[in-house]
Amino acid sequence: MNYLWFKAFHIVGVVVWFAGLFYLVRLFVYHVEANEQPEPARSILQQQYQIMEKRLYKLITTPGMVLTVVMAIAMLVTTPELLRDTWLQVKMSLVAVLIGYHHYCARLMKQMAADKFALGSQQMRWLNEVPTVFLVVIVLLAVFKNNLPTDVTAWGVLALIVAMAAIIQLYARKRRLDKEKLAATADPSMSSMANVSANNGHASEVRAG
């Protein structure tokens, strides 16, 4: 009975942890893009994103990770024979890497709070998809256990990565084209303003003459 309680709260922890990771790095994307904005929008947005990231990391993401790990340990204490299963050993290795990813996000958060941006928005989008791949593989391991079809899983994960890469590239292209259109529409207005200023200056010279 204790095992089932531990398992239930382990699943709750996983849901909370992954939800926090997905949203946290998405905030990183917006934070980096806010750095490209002119003042005062840049400072206002960055300050807001720093507050949101800090609260999300401390109040949701980290507690979710702790609950996941603690409940997993409790499950292993009640049923230590599970440690002999290959699928669980692989799953634990993936979770260890995911914990490293979790702490890497904390490092990026501190860097951005210090106005240091090591990654661009597109790189952040790539980083944001890492938990998706881990989630898929971990869930498949938990469901199929030692019966997981490795060939199908490998091809499926590869297809997922290719699809995510295509989406990221398409969005980057769309964003670049939108910027070019915005710049193109802004140039004529700037030219008109320059012409008006020049005409006003010329008129002033004529009146002075």
Model-derived regions: residue spans:
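Polytopic transmembrane helical bundles with strong interfacial aromatic enrichment
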Residues: 1-209
